Amino acid sequence: MERKPVVIPQEALEKEAAVCGQIKALWASRGRTPRAFVDTYGCQQNEADSERIRGMLRASGYEIVDTEEGADCIVINTCAIREHAETRVYGNVGALVHTKARHPEQKIFLCGCMMGQPQVVERIKNSYRHVDGVFNPHELWRFPELLQSVLRTNKRIFAVDDSAGNIAEGIPVVRSSDLKAWVSIMYGCNNFCSYCIVPYVRGRERSRRPEEILEEVKGLIAAGYKDITLLGQNVNSYGKDLGLGVDFADLMAEIAQLPGEFWLRFMTSHPKDASKKLFDTIAKYPKITKQFHLPFQSGNDRVLKAMNRHYTREEYLKLAHYGRAIMPDLVLTSDVIVGFPGETEDEFEDTISLIEDVRYDALFTFIFSPRAGTPAAKMDDPTPKEEKNRRFDRLCDVQNRISLEIHQGYVGKTVRVLCDGRDKDMLTARTEGGRLVRFAGDDSLIGQFFDVTITGCTTWSLVGELR
């Protein structure tokens, strides 16, 4: 039986909004405008969370700045998916002790997935005394009252509720782009892959109600947003906890029929919950980009079982082949882990052969990183680091060759793009499949859809000319 999502009551959110007003009044009484810096690590969900943090800070009277130097409030939104990300966070948080020494009144907060791990919170308490506050993803909506408490008392605060999570609607947002927007449709994950810390720190799956999502998307379209991405740890599970008979494909179809000129994307998916219905929906509606990020992680059944992925190589390939059969221009991307505990050379070769079979447009490749508290962290791992690095390099070489071959096939073709900025002397744009295109043009094209003819390519990007 699916759990019903816990929705934060409107009166509680109104209380937080009132606190924002009180903080704003406090700074007005001091005769100056405070500044805040938000630093984000990790995935797109963290980016979306940081936009809400910036929204609450702006509602509290803060000017959002792009450096920690001289900021009155610093918020670091952390990532726990790999050891490298955590190491960077610890290093940067440690360096802030010098920044705070120059600005003693500065308030420093840590949030995000690392703060969902008790051992991390204890380390922050004991070894990073210059940090004023900590809150985990479930407590994000309470940030105004946490900030107010620290401002009033100068006492450290740790809000690390261990609940299964919640949903808070109507939190103010300061988006990082006026062209592209993230829309969280659900939070948490129920899958418990053996290597992944996310379900432990993000909680169980909770879906937003479809009418709330539609209202947000309508507002974005009205504001001129052209590229909208629906976010969730596993969007394919959307709606299962609501009991409304609305699944992810239904939600996508409803959004795709809204008036306006925009592209609709989504991430991330889990293959065990992907369906032909979803592929059919993508194929049916022009506004849904012909792009599917479908992480396979390994091409070997024994490794997939050890990862607790709940699908086989054959089941995955059937999905990928079906998508390409009904949409020959479908852009397929994926995640893959190299060096999972116990992976043999033959099992690694199964991963290589799957990549050759599917011919992904791009891969996000990682060497296995053990996460404390996950089953995989306790597995015997006899493969030397040097061997893992060799396999990683070989896999990247294979994928880079395939990516270049696919890009070479675009030369001479005309594609639709959305121009998103300038890089030195060239404009940059993205195809609906997310490919980077560089071309000469005027800045007036930024934010517009138009056609370009591809004249050249590299492994990672295309070069084009305006039609």
Feature locations, PLM:
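Terminal RNA-binding accessory module
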Residues: M1, V6, K378-R467
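Proteins enriched for Cys/Gly/acidic motifs involved in redox and nucleic-acid/cofactor modification
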Residues: M1-Y238, K277, F292, E314-A325, ...
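Short glycine-enriched, charge-decorated loop/helix-capping segments at active-site entrances
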Residues: A80-I81, R202-G203, L242-G245, K305-Y311, ...
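Conserved SAM/AdoMet-binding glycine-rich loop
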Residues: E105-L110, P118-Q119, A222-E345
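Short flexible coil/turn linkers enriched for glycine and charged/polar residues
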Residues: S176-L179, C189-N191, I288, S298, ...
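Conserved, mostly hydrophobic/aromatic
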Residues: C193, I213, L230, F266, ...
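Contiguous mid-protein beta-loop-alpha structural module that forms a pocket-lining wall or clamp
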Residues: E343, V358-Y360
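Short, acidic/polar
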Residues: E347-S353
